[in-house]
Amino acid sequence: DISLSIPQKTTTAIVGPSGGGKSTLCNLIARFWDVDSGEVTLGGVNVKDYSMNSLMSNFSFVFQSVYLFADTIENNIKFGRQDASHEEVVEAAKKACCHDFISKLPDGYDTVIGEGGATLSGGEKQRISIARAIMKDAPIVILDEATANVDPENEKELMDAVDALTKEKTIIMIAHRLKTVRHADQIVVVDKGRIVQQGTHEQLMKQEGIYKRFVDARQQAVSWKLAR
């Protein structure tokens, strides 16, 4: 059983062991799956009472595995809002820190990319997906390990892009990276399909549990100390 409230315009980080239920929880929130019992509500309304188009208009998604269409970069970004002008596409790309590398491509925004975006690096593909989400401008953003496989050179630009996307939004974030979760308004620890801990970073560090072990293991692995 899970009971969770996510206030509007806050950041909720979901952490836990692999297979513990993090992705399942996000799938239920967005109604990719339906609950067997109980209910999931959005703004006090059961998600089953929304039309699928109406429900999806409330969400933007940035997944670890990015899918791009075999089309121009501009059309890939405009997928977030089909009626967007070229100027609006460029503005979204600038916010997502991908305008510079797009401008260097042979045909700029008219460059056709292969199915899956094979001609782009992982960080570039993720920034285009973030530009798409910025274009959509949905009130709720679900980030599924969006920075997990990014090389150090691209990480800062990607994090800047995520910051641009998440301003004034309700954020639900699955992540393994400590620095992306420690400033969340609430951290939810999921294990074996249950919420086993919930609170802020400071609160959870005072408890003996999965979260403290998660933090201690990462500090030991990379020999860093959290900024006080």
PLM features per residue range, with description:
Residues 1-228:
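ABC-type nucleotide-binding domain
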